[in-house]
């Protein structure tokens, strides 16, 4: 650059009115060629200024809208993948390490392991291309003290997690609050959990220290599915489940049901069975009655057609009688009528035969 750079600097230090027009044009042309600047025409510059004014007047998005529109995972858990964050969250997110699997840690109680848990673990597994997913599980003593009673014990919950295909490692007796020492001990690169602040006795958000050091990856919750929701469904239909288990032979003491409650549920169960039986029999009886009426009407129509147009060589139409209830009544009536008219004829035949036998003897 040398002398030319010095000349340019000297020119810039001089007042504009002291520089000749030709000299100004030479300077501008020289700087344009050197730095490849694009000089806009006055009209184009005015258009750019108008666009910038429009951008300034347009309402800016709130931080909440920005955080919702930009997430490190996609909406659908099947296509979860890491995305570059053009707009950061309220906390930083570090770049993943290269040349080795990324060790991601996800913790929780995971009681009554359900689809919401599975989708959370799937997001954690797919947040980077190569992830080793570690799942932390607090023991029963810690969980019952800080969160409440669980349906499954810690061994059952750990075994359920081991059968999930997204999980590479289950860490039992995990701490309730993640500390830097814990991250260092297990060489954890990131912690994956939903972004809702999880309060404890000592902190408003137990994941806040992890967020501050850039090791927190937010996942999305599955709405409408939770362990509390499953328990609510069971409690809502409590009597039905108890009656079902009692009918299957489960002891009432195992169900924590008193003798009075058991007798009440037994009575309700018997009433329900009786009602269902009557309903089912009524349905079957109605179905048979409809079939008999249909058969009777079709037989009557056939008889009428045969009487109107008899077949050659047949004096009476042959048709199968009705079946079912009406068929039985019809056959019974036919037997009664035939026996009523046949008895005198049979008696006359017996009397005639006896008289002829007497005449022969004489």
UniProtKB/Swiss-Prot annotation:
Gene3D superfamilies: HUPs. Residues 1-79, 308-362 are annotated as: Disordered. Its EC number is 2.7.7.15. CTP binds at residues 109-117, 147, 193-194, 198, 221-225. Residues 1-37 have a biased composition (Basic and acidic residues). GO terms for biological process: CDP-choline pathway. It comes from the Eukaryota. It is found in: Nucleus. Keywords: Lipid biosynthesis, Lipid metabolism, Nucleotidyltransferase, Nucleus, Phospholipid biosynthesis, Phospholipid metabolism, Phosphoprotein, Transferase. GO terms for cellular component: nuclear envelope; nucleus. GO terms for molecular function: choline-phosphate cytidylyltransferase activity; phosphatidylcholine binding. The modification Phosphoserine is found at residues 315, 319, 355. Substrate binds at residues 147, 176. It catalyses: phosphocholine + CTP + H(+) = CDP-choline + diphosphate. Residues 313-323, 351-362 have a biased composition (Low complexity). Pfam families: CTP_transf_like. The modification Phosphothreonine is found at residue 323. InterPro entries: CCT, Cyt_trans-like, Pcy1-like, Rossmann-like_a/b/a_fold. Belongs to the cytidylyltransferase family. This is Probable choline-phosphate cytidylyltransferase. It comes from Schizosaccharomyces pombe (strain 972 / ATCC 24843) (Fission yeast). The lineage of its organism: Eukaryota, Fungi, Dikarya, Ascomycota, Taphrinomycotina.
């Amino acid at each position: 650059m040398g002398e030319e750079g010095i000349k340019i600097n000297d020119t810039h230090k001089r007042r504009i009115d002291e520089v000749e027009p030709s000299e100004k044009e030479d300077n501008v042309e020289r700087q344009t060629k050197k730095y490849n600047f694009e000089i806009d025409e006055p009209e184009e510059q005015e258009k750019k200024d108008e666009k910038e004014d429009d951008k300034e007047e347009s309402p800016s998005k709130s931080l909440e809208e920005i955080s919702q529109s930009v997430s490190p995972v996609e909406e659908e858990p099947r296509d979860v993948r890491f995305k570059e964050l053009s707009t950061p969250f309220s906390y930083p997110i570090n770049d993943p390490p290269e040349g080795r699997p990324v060790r991601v840690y996800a913790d929780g109680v995971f009681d009554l392991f359900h689809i919401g848990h599975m989708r959370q673990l799937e997001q954690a597994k797919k947040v980077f291309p190569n992830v080793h997913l570690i799942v932390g599980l607090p023991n029963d003593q810690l969980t019952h003290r800080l969160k409440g009673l669980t349906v499954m014990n810690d061994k059952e919950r750990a075994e359920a997690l081991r059968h999930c295909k997204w999980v590479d490692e289950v860490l039992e007796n995990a701490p309730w609050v993640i500390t830097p020492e814990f991250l260092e001990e297990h060489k954890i690169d990131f912690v994956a959990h939903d972004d809702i602040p999880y309060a404890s006795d000592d902190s408003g958000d137990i994941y806040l220290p992890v967020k501050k050091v850039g090791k927190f990856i937010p996942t999305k919750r599955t709405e409408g599915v939770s362990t509390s929701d499953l328990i609510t469904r069971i409690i809502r239909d409590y009597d039905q489940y108890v009656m079902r288990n009692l009918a299957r032979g489960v002891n009432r003491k195992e169900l924590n049901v008193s003798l009075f409650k058991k007798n009440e549920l037994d009575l309700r169960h018997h009433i329900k069975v009786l009602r269902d039986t009557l309903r089912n029999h009524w349905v079957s009886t109605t179905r048979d009655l409809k079939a008999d009426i249909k058969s009777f009407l079709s037989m009557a129509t056939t008889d009428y057609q045969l009487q109107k147009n008899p077949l050659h060589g047949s004096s009476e139409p042959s048709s199968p009688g009705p079946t079912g209830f009406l068929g039985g009544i019809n056959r019974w009536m036919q037997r009664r009528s035939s026996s009523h008219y046949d008895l005198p004829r049979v008696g006359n035949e017996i009397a005639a035969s006896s008289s002829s036998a007497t005449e022969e003897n004489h």
